[in-house]
Amino acid sequence: MTTIVSVRRNGHVVIAGDGQATLGNTVMKGNVKKVRRLYNDKVIAGFAGGTADAFTLFELFERKLEMHQGHLVKAAVELAKDWRTDRMLRKLEALLAVADETASLIITGNGDVVQPENDLIAIGSGGPYARAAARALLENTELGAREIAEKALDIAGDICIYTNHFHTIEELTAKA
């Protein structure tokens, strides 16, 4: 699996992910970019799960964003509907964390679109560790979203064998 974490604070939203790809219990690659920008750099997204499946979902999600003029929630709901009802898509195994200036969402293959409490997302095998670390930092420090995401990924990478210390980080800043 992997670890993807998203943190929102003080007008900034970050999605960060590690770079480890495994096949069974073997590390196949250590610098996979699991976080990317979509829809003219207005949306950021990260994935946990099968790499090929995730890239298929990124492509489908970007099409949904274009169909709905960048409206994140509508695009996410439409992707989740298709993912749940299409026989071929149902076989895809991945989770997506997506965010724009105003919303952060988790999209699952079960058709769920979840807006998490405190706009804190952590998915993948290291997700519970990253979530705990990020929550503690959000509640007890004045660190920015990027620093919190980096530290949360570092902690997850120290604990989870499927998470490494190669990070890809994308950030959006809300327009004033």
Curated annotation (Swiss-Prot):
Na(+) binds at residues 157, 160, 163. Allosterically activated by HslU binding. It comes from Salmonella gallinarum (strain 287/91 / NCTC 13346). Disulfide bonds: none annotated. InterPro entries: ATP-dep_Prtase_HsIV_su, Ntn_hydrolases_N, Proteasome_sua/b, Proteasome_suB-type. Induction: By heat shock. Protease subunit of a proteasome-like degradation complex believed to be a general protein degrading machinery. The active site is at residue 2. GO terms for molecular function: metal ion binding; threonine-type endopeptidase activity. Transmembrane segments: none annotated. It is found in: Cytoplasm. Its EC number is 3.4.25.2. This is ATP-dependent protease subunit HslV. GO terms for biological process: proteolysis involved in protein catabolic process. It is an enzyme of class 3 (hydrolase). Belongs to the peptidase T1B family. HslV subfamily. A double ring-shaped homohexamer of HslV is capped on each side by a ring-shaped HslU homohexamer. The assembly of the HslU/HslV complex is dependent on binding of ATP. It catalyses: ATP-dependent cleavage of peptide bonds with broad specificity.
